[in-house]
């Protein structure tokens, strides 16, 4: 994880091209005035049929489905883990050693919401959630 940690602020984005549409931490609700949400990751909108990509080399430790969020893949980088959610097709299996920028899976396209394709991305150090925006290059 030393290499991962040394690359803070310089990791490639988990998509080829995208824009952050949901920020980390406590955010005001877009519609409901007195409601806040506490995001444990970031939401990145990208082009339909885009792939999620590993931000650093590591080992695939989990892949599973979450109701309402399609599939999730977790990659371990020593003491760190990256989480990629809202995937449909998964290209990797548990135990795979993958490289930075390697495609992990196809991001879900929401046909009922203007064909939006949004990846939910998290970074963890052990059990402590990190702000992914502090890790990816600007």
Question: Where do the model's predicted regions map?
Answer:
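Extracytoplasmic/periplasmic cell wall- or extracellular glycan-interacting regions that localize
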Residues: 1-62, 67-70, 76, 83, ...
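A structural signal for short beta-strand/turn segments enriched in small hydrophobics and glycine
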Residues: 20, 58-60, 95-107
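Short hydrophobic beta/alpha edge segments that flank linear recognition/processing sites
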Residues: 44, 72-73, 99-112
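Short histidine-centered loop motifs in beta-beta connectors
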Residues: 63, 80-97, 101
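Short, conserved catalytic or interaction motifs in soluble domains
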Residues: 65, 89, 109-112
């Amino acid at each position: 994880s030393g290499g991962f940690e040394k690359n803070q602020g310089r990791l490639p984005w988990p998509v080829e091209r995208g824009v952050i549409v949901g920020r980390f931490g406590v955010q005001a609700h877009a519609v409901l005035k007195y409601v806040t949400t506490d995001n444990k990751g970031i939401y990145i909108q990208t082009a339909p049929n885009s792939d999620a990509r590993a931000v650093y080399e590591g080992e695939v430790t989990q892949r599973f489905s979450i109701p309402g969020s399609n599939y999730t893949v977790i990659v371990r980088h020593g003491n760190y883990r990256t989480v990629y959610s809202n995937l449909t097709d998964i290209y990797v299996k548990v135990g795979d050693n993958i490289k930075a920028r390697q495609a992990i899976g196809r991001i879900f396209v929401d046909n009922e919401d203007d064909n939006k394709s949004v990846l939910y991305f998290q970074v963890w150090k052990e059990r402590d959630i990190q702000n992914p925006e502090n890790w990816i290059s600007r």
